[in-house]
């Protein structure tokens, strides 16, 4: 079972994926879980930068990586969740 942070980040990424795909998620994608690859949702490096900005604002954190680093290090939703979780713990 996903924790609250995972649920919130999946929702944010799902919303972004919908906007990147004309307002819908193709049925072929299926369920969106922490294992889901960002590219399978149509999220590219520019869209990832948008979601990282939104997460910084939502959680009061600063993600210290440029878009290229983020793109190479954050391959799936779980990677994003763990990066945010670590930064939240650091801020506490």
Curated annotation (Swiss-Prot):
Q: How is it modified after translation?
A: 4'-phosphopantetheine is transferred from CoA to a specific serine of apo-NodF.
Q: Which domain of life is it from?
A: Bacteria
Q: Which SUPFAM superfamilies does the annotation name?
A: ACP-like
Q: Where is the Carrier domain?
A: 4-88
Q: NAD as a keyword?
A: no
What Gene3D superfamilies does the annotation carry? ACP-like
Instruction: Say if the entry is tagged with keyword Disulfide bond.
Output: no
Q: Briefly state the protein's biological role.
A: Proposed to synthesize nod factor fatty acyl chain. Involved in trans-2,trans-4,trans-6,cis-11-octadecatetraenoic acid biosynthesis.
The name this protein goes by in its record: Nodulation protein F
> What keywords would UniProt list here?
Nodulation, Phosphopantetheine, Phosphoprotein, Plasmid
């Amino acid at each position: 079972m996903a924790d609250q942070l995972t649920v919130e980040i999946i929702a944010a990424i799902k919303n972004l994926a919908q906007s990147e795909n004309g307002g819908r998620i193709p049925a072929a994608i299926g369920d969106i879980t922490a294992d889901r690859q960002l590219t399978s949702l149509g999220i590219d490096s520019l869209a990832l930068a948008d979601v990282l900005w939104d997460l910084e604002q939502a959680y009061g954190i600063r993600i210290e990586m440029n878009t290229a680093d983020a793109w190479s290090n954050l391959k799936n939703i779980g990677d994003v969740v763990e990066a945010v979780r670590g930064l939240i713990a650091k801020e506490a």
